[in-house]
């Protein structure tokens, strides 16, 4: 998350939804969410924003934990309306969903559809699979937790996210005459 990529208003003004108060702010060049107890005004937790997702309609914010997992946080910035919105108001679900019902691990969920060339990169898969074989349960059970070394070819939804690598298409369409010919004849581009 950089000043060039962050679109949200991190001005320290608290935002309260579903009985939870979050204070988005900047400090020492970084971006943070403080989770505040609305009854006592005491800070419960601080999450550093390390990655952004989205730049057109709304922007989501991710923090990272020691195991390499990126976590999608509960509040997003609505770019057109210039306001904070809770994730429960954006994703379909019951009105009584818990505050954190749309918080997610980006490495295993969001990465697959919202990026080009995703590799979730569970770095300790052998350990996890051996634990499962012996009856252990990962993620909060008796077994080891997932550790991530995720990568993508390109962050965000690009042509290749749905259509696959586009090198042949790009190479053939460098020639503007070919593009005009296809446009004016109405012929489909086979690449």
Regions found by a protein language model. Give the residues of each.
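Active-site-surrounding "flap" and adjacent substrate/cofactor-binding loops of secreted or lumenal enzymes
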Residues: 2-12
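A conserved amphipathic helix/loop scaffold
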Residues: 16-18
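Extended surface/linker regions that mediate inter-domain or inter-protein docking
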Residues: 21-191
């Amino acid at each position: 998350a950089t000043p060039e990529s962050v679109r949200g208003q991190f001005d320290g003004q608290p935002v309260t939804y579903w009985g939870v108060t979050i204070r988005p702010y900047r400090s020492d060049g970084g971006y943070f969410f403080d989770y505040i107890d609305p009854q006592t005004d005491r800070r419960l937790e601080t999450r550093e924003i390390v990655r952004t997702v989205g730049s057109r309609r709304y922007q989501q914010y991710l923090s990272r934990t020691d195991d390499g997992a990126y976590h999608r946080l509960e509040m997003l910035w609505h770019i057109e309306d210039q306001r904070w919105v809770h994730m429960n108001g954006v994703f379909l679900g019951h009105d009584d969903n818990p505050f954190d019902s749309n918080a997610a691990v980006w490495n295993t969920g969001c990465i697959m559809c919202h990026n080009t060339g995703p590799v979730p990169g569970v770095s300790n898969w052998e350990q996890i699979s051996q634990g499962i074989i012996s009856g252990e349960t990962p993620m909060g059970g008796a077994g080891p937790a997932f550790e991530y070394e995720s990568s993508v070819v390109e962050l965000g939804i690009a042509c290749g996210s749905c259509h696959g690598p586009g090198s042949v298409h790009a190479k053939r369409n460098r020639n503007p005459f070919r593009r005009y010919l296809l446009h004016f004849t109405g012929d489909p581009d086979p690449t």
